[in-house]
Amino acid sequence: MNLVQLGKLHENVLDAGCEPNRNARYLASLGYKVVGIDISERAISKAIDKTSSEKSNVNFNQRDFSRLNEFKGHFDTVIDIGCFHSILNSDHEPYTASLSHICHSDSSVFLRAFSETNKSRYRRWQGHKRYSLALKRNNVKKLSL
């Protein structure tokens, strides 16, 4: 499913856990204003190197997702392709609180995570019910899984 073709993405996009940065770069090439964050300094260095020769609307930052105070209400769209399900259980609440902080009432969050029913990929990841509960506790209302 292509969120761009479906018209689901809006101007200011956050790519959470942006390695290998192809989503951030692709969306920036289409004119979206994109911020790509990853906790890995190496991932961000690679992303910056890849985009250094491109004119683009993408800004990469090495950050802990739970520390995005300067972006209050900034993002129209957040995409998370595999970040949330790979963080520690103890980081779920700070992560979802940050989502609530950086989004506004009309923002959309697109979260892709491993499924417990896909046994070939399942490696003690937390289930979707746990994700949904953490998101609801922090008032993240628009969510596509």
Swiss-Prot record:
Source superkingdom: Eukaryota
Pfam families documented for this protein: Methyltransf_25 (PF13649)
Gene Ontology terms: cellular component: cytosol; nucleus
EC number of the protein: 2.1.1.-
Enzyme class, broadest EC rank: transferase
Annotated coiled-coil segments of the chain: none
Keyword terms, alphabetized: Methyltransferase, Transferase
InterPro entries: Methyltransf_25, SAM-dependent_MTases_sf
GO molecular function, a single term: methyltransferase activity
One of the GO BP terms on file: methylation
Family: Belongs to the methyltransferase superfamily.
Chain's role: Probable methyltransferase.
Matches recorded under PANTHER family: JUVENILE HORMONE ACID O-METHYLTRANSFERASE, METHYLTRANSFERASE
Name the UniProt record assigns to this protein: Uncharacterized methyltransferase C1348.04
Organism: Schizosaccharomyces pombe (strain 972 / ATCC 24843) (Fission yeast)
